Amino acid sequence: MPLPQPLLGGASPAPARAASSFLHPLLHTRHRVSTAPAAASSFVPASHSSHANDAMLLRRAADVADRSAGLTSPHPNFGCVIARPQLNTDSADSWVVGEGFLYAQGTPCAELLASQEAGEHARGGTAYLNLEPGDCFGDNTAVGSLVQAGITRVVVGLRHPLKHLRGKAIQALRNEGIQVDVVGEDLQSKLFKEALKSCLTVNAPLLYRAAFHVPFSVLKYAMTADGKIAASSGHASWISGKASRGRVFELRGRSDAVIVGGNTVRFDDPRLTARHVKGHVPVRIVMSQSLNLPEEANLWNLNDAYTIVATQRGARRDFQRKLAMKGVEVVEFDMLNPRAVMSYCYDRGYLAVLWECGGTLAASAISASVIHKVYAFWAPKIIGGLNAPTPVGELGMSQMTQAINLIDVSYEQIDRDMLMSGFIEPIPDLSPVIPSVEEIPSIDPEVSPYETNIISFYKTWDIFGAFSNFSPHSIQMPDENGDYFTWPTVEHYYQAHKFVGVDNPQARDIVQEIKLAKSPEEAARIGRTRQKGFPELVRTDWESTKIDVMYRAIKCKFSTYPHLTNMLLSTAGSVLVEASPHDLFWGGGREGEGLNYLGRLLMQLRSEILGTVPASAEVGEAD
């Protein structure tokens, strides 16, 4: 059965406009100058009411973008609101004909969902985007969706903060004759101040990651009215009330990982889960130099969540082996400190990290400039105690004038408690650092700028993110019955085939569950947990066939989307590495110790397309 040739990366065919220059703008843009004067980046005066409506709808787009919080792991938050003014009402809210948001990495983009909801009502309308499109490098569905929907104007809150994506979608839209107004450039009214703040806040993790090359880090603690986080004995359950603890669960759900120190494990034995049945569960990280930790602890139970122990190189190798037997990942550092751990979290692709540690580790993290925001829960209790611990240990400050003043402070009463939050480091606004079109790099599929370089890929929004199994590119491949089925991503296909062909109703149920997974993240979680919990349901030949299963899937993906093939060919001469620091089979590993089979399969496919190796060659023979 021939495979379809989609017009757009991941999008279903839709009524086409006359020109098709939008098909692959991210691949072929070569410093083109827009031929549409109306779409040029020049300020056009508008009425006060028009600006007010634009600002309100842009804030709504930012609110919509935040709807996946806690449901999936942190990712760039995209929201799209499509509106058309109605003659019978002045309420901008009633003008909305469609809206959508990015649910998770590798899922349909906000612009496509909003366009589908609006249908024909989108034609001639305005699309409000809190962030310039760019949820997957190499995929141009967002731009194509707006063009095909007949959108005539786009209002953008922020340019994309990542350099390899910044300005490209905006230029592609303008090249299609669509008017694009960017807050702070084309729209400079004071009315947009709050709208811009909303756009910055909803993507604070992405902005901090782009600016500082570490995840957005939040320090959270609960303390008594006299500033204690525990009694002198170390007992700390509970300082804050149930409602405040519920808010903490929300903070965890918004984080890739939760970090604690060894004392927290020894004294509190926490679980550090988000306490919900479905949704995102953060990784738990324990920092311990000595590894003087209990052999039995809630954090070693991986049924709740995954756990990483970060320690000094060489510490208690016998205990490391015991943790590894339980499935706990142990990561050694030459110098264990907050900055090193945050660099490691950055390499894992984390956007947001929550610190729930004691005062000593909190002080070290603040001193290392890796804490960006503080959430302090005050409880109306007094515990006293000369030796009772406080939220932050020694910072080396002797005068009050040296104190760190929090920025953009807010207060909220939560039942009997008070929540104070504020930033140590303000949210970076990268909008002043905007390259001209001539400075925006392009990818020419005909000429490779790489020779023998190593090209890394991992998260979909990173450069070459379309090489990831999580990229939003569906494939048509046979299912367990031999019938062609549209798998949402390569990851869905791969995880399901762990159980395909097993003569057991439970295995068949797992395949169906993975098929229906809303995101590749969810598909991976189902496949991995079922494989671990029910090894008898995994096909007996899985270890010998999984490489072939993966190769069939990625080969289908690249043959279905020609622009991805062009991108792959543009890397000729370079080594491709999946930059996973923890997956030592498919990825390259933290220090290059990984087998990098995904990168090797992509290089084999590249060589096969170029005709340098036969299709039957083993993966180990790939370039």
From Swiss-Prot:
GO cellular component, as recorded: chloroplast
GO biological process, one term: response to high light intensity
Keywords recorded for this protein, A-Z: Chloroplast, Glycosidase, Hydrolase, Multifunctional enzyme, NADP, Oxidoreductase, Plastid, Transit peptide
CMP/dCMP-type deaminase domain boundaries: 52-181
Outcome of gene disruption: Lethal when homozygous. Required for both endosperm and embryo formation in the seed.
Domain of life: Eukaryota
Molecular function per GO: 5-amino-6-(5-phosphoribosylamino)uracil reductase activity; diaminohydroxyphosphoribosylaminopyrimidine deaminase activity; dihydropyrimidine dehydrogenase (NADP+) activity; hydrolase activity, hydrolyzing N-glycosyl compounds; NADP binding
Transmembrane segments: none
Pathway where it operates: Cofactor biosynthesis; riboflavin biosynthesis; 5-amino-6-(D-ribitylamino)uracil from GTP: step 3/4
Function description: Pyrimidine reductase involved in the riboflavin biosynthesis pathway. Also has a non-functional N-terminal deaminase domain that lacks the catalytically essential zinc-binding residues. 39% activity when NADH replaces NADPH. No evidence for a phosphatase activity conferred by the N-terminal domain.
PANTHER family: 2,5-DIAMINO-6-RIBOSYLAMINO-4(3H)-PYRIMIDINONE 5'-PHOSPHATE REDUCTASE, DIHYDROFOLATE REDUCTASE FAMILY PROTEIN (AFU_ORTHOLOGUE AFUA_8G06820)
Other facts noted in the record for this chain: Unlike bacteria that have a bifunctional, two-domain RibD enzyme, plants have a monofunctional reductase and a monofunctional deaminase, each having an enzymatically inactive domain.
Name this protein carries in UniProt: Riboflavin biosynthesis protein PYRR, chloroplastic
Organism field: Zea mays (Maize)
Gene: PYRR
